[in-house]
From Swiss-Prot:
SUPFAM superfamilies: Helical backbone' metal receptor (SSF53807). Belongs to the BchN/ChlN family. Its EC number is 1.3.7.7. It is an enzyme of class 1 (oxidoreductase). Component of the dark-operative protochlorophyllide reductase (DPOR) that uses Mg-ATP and reduced ferredoxin to reduce ring D of protochlorophyllide (Pchlide) to form chlorophyllide a (Chlide). This reaction is light-independent. The NB-protein (ChlN-ChlB) is the catalytic component of the complex. Binds 1 [4Fe-4S] cluster per heterodimer. The cluster is bound at the heterodimer interface by residues from both subunits. This is Light-independent protochlorophyllide reductase subunit N. [4Fe-4S] cluster binds at residues 23, 48, 108. Keywords: 4Fe-4S, ATP-binding, Chlorophyll biosynthesis, Chloroplast, Iron, Iron-sulfur, Metal-binding, Nucleotide-binding, Oxidoreductase, Photosynthesis, Plastid. HAMAP family: ChlN_BchN.
Length: 470
């Protein structure tokens, strides 16, 4: 395809206004594991229960820390008292599991029948003496990963208030330690680390990452003498970070715009608008932005990024010059597209269910900068794309790879287009310097499979002549 068929500038379009994504209640899959003392109660129909059982793949005897409050005809027709039914379930949860927090997840059905979960939660919380957080993760209003966004936004309101005096006391302790350094005492161990890492306002990072990935990112910032005061969500509900006026917050995922808004408007935090730490280029830009806000000169980031790119050379040789088409599912599309363009790929289109241009402004700027740096045409960004139109565009463009939701994968494969499920990028470890290889492992898997089939001479049997797309 010639570059004339691809826009030369970053263009934004909006098509149908419909969401074609995985259900947002799937956020329970990773959040119940992240918040170790939590219990998630999904209030919905049997359909929601079937989805969770199939998507999460957890057997009932494993006693996972989530459950379904199944709505029946009596609930929907208002013959049963919603409050009493939820109270019965929560009392049973407290007796069996005794969690530190219960998270109610609202679904499409609770929205349609106007169930007042927010009104019932404070009353029940006072009765059973367990915090109850209400999050609306319904598929009518939200896309796949925005389920996590609604949960974190609700938890942001439960974070303790940051007190300026605590920081002042910390500064006094450091001053005392500095004074005592002139009068060394025997058998006294004074660590200089807190002094080095606290010459800036408190920093809270928000976004659910596996513990090892969060530790890696915290360590990368520590190397720049930046101390992370806390993560939202924390591993335990009782360890939620203190937020408030004077606290800086920064997101690690592009789908957390609601959480960012809550932290800024309701908790008066200052948001650091940065690209997201996906890929070595994004991670470097993310750290550099935080350093610039705190007036810190970054050290060794250029060498660190170059070292990572060098380790990816075998994958880069495979993807260079290949084309990719994002149909849109998990709101990670812009960050992944930017990274793949930096790897030498051509991105024809970035479909995305929802785009908050303010929250993703730095990421969009880095995307445009990357396209100019690599000399590739800038992709068109289509918000709420119409799948029929997308299939027609793919028929014309014939990309080497389509990153799509599971519903479209098999039909596209049957028509000769290699696919990769977008949901795999959601559950994979893709953040930070060290996990860039995992992204390329996922992207190149269908490409390597095709090469293997050709080498074996089986392509004629497995992949017949391409059928015209309908």
């Amino acid at each position: 395809m010639s570059s004339k068929q691809v826009p030369d500038t970053l263009t934004f379009e909006c098509e149908t206004g419909n969401y074609h994504t995985f259900c947002p209640i799937s956020c329970v899959a990773w959040l119940y594991q992240k918040i170790e003392d939590s219990f998630f109660l999904v209030v919905g129909t049997k359909t929601c229960g079937y989805f969770l059982q199939n998507a999460l793949g957890v057997m009932i005897f494993a006693e996972p820390r989530y459950a379904m409050a199944e709505l029946e005809e009596g609930d929907i027709s208002a013959q049963l008292n919603d409050y009493e039914e939820l109270k019965r379930l929560c009392v049973q949860i407290k007796k069996d599991r005794n969690p530190s927090v219960i998270v109610w997840i609202g679904t499409c059905t609770t929205e349609i029948i106007k169930m007042d979960l927010e009104g019932m939660a404070p009353r029940l919380e006072a009765e059973i003496d367990i915090p109850i957080v209400v999050a609306r993760a319904n598929g009518l209003d939200y896309a796949f990963t925005q389920g996590e966004d609604t949960v974190l936004a609700a938890m942001a309101n439960r974070c303790p208030e940051w007190i300026q005096n605590a920081q002042n006391n910390n500064d006094q302790d450091q001053a005392i330690q500095g004074l005592m350094s002139f009068f060394p005492l025997k058998n006294t161990k004074l660590s200089s680390e807190p002094t080095l890492l606290s010459n800036h306002p408190p920093l809270v990072l928000f976004g659910s990452l596996p513990s090892n990935v969060a530790s890696q990112i915290t360590l990368e910032l520590k190397r720049q003498n930046i101390h992370v005061s806390g993560w939202l969500p924390a591993q335990r509900y009782s360890e939620l970070p203190s937020v408030g006026e004077g606290v800086y917050v920064c997101g690690v995922n592009p789908f957390l715009s609601r959480t960012a808004t809550t932290l800024m408007r309701r908790r008066k935090c200052k948001l650091i608008g940065a690209p997201f730490p996906i890929g070595p280029d994004g991670t470097r830009a993310w750290i550099e932005k935080i350093c610039s806000v705190f007036g810190i000169e970054p050290q060794g980031l250029e060498e660190r990024e170059a070292q990572v790119w060098k380790g990816l050379q075998d994958y880069l040789d495979l993807v260079r010059g290949k084309s990719v088409f994002f149909m849109g599912d998990n709101l990670l599309e812009v960050s992944l597209a930017r990274f793949l363009i930096r790897c030498g790929m051509i991105v024809y289109e970035i479909g995305i269910p929802y785009m908050d241009k303010r929250y993703q402004a730095a990421e969009l700027a880095l995307l445009q900068q990357t396209c100019e740096q690599m000399g590739t045409p800038m992709p068109r960004i289509v918000e709420k794309p119409d799948n029929y139109n997308q299939v027609q565009r793919m028929r014309e463009l014939q990309p080497d790879l389509a990153i799509t939701g599971m519903a479209h994968a098999n039909p596209l494969e049957a028509r000769g287009i290699s696919t990769k499920w977008s949901v795999e990028f959601t559950f994979a470890q893709i953040h930070g310097f060290t996990n860039a290889r995992d992204i390329l492992e996922l992207v190149t898997r269908p490409l390597r499979r095709n090469l293997s089939l050709e080498d074996l001479g089986w392509s004629a049997l497995v992949k017949r002549d391409k059928i015209n797309l309908v």
